[in-house]
Amino acid sequence: MLNSFIEQFISYLEIVRNFSINTLYNYKRDLNKLEIFLTKNKINSPESIKEHHIREFINKERRRGLSPKSLKRMLSSFRSFFNYLLEEGILKANPAHSVTSPKTSSTLPKAMDVDLVKKLLDFTPKGLFEIRDKAMAELMYSSGLRLSELCNLNLTDISVKERSCRVSGKGRKM
């Protein structure tokens, strides 16, 4: 029964909220893991899910070695899902609302090594694929694009005349 609500929620995120494929995948994976845990504990309806079930699941995942960052993302998925069920009138309270997220250390991205950047910029491509790969690496390095943003670029997004490209960022923002 919970699975049909999960599918509805994922469709809502895709169609109404316009979430990226990666985000949809992560939400679905997190919610499916929770559903398996709940089913094993004979909890089959959303109304039966209590705060202690969410805490128990998170603690189980922590003991399995999941990182605080992953646990935080999972809790965020659960809170969003239960808020959706609240809005749909299926639940009266969000069982994940009071579950505290684990503390995560904020880490800055690692800068590329100077020698590696020099090698990249000095590299002379020999064929079409190497020319393409060097152009992609230089674009990513010089503009700070995410890998997913680079992979989603189309030829129509690039203007050689204006020396610019149009990028759909995280959350499909331009």
Please state what every model-predicted region is.
Residues M1-M174:
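Conserved catalytic core of the tyrosine transesterase superfamily
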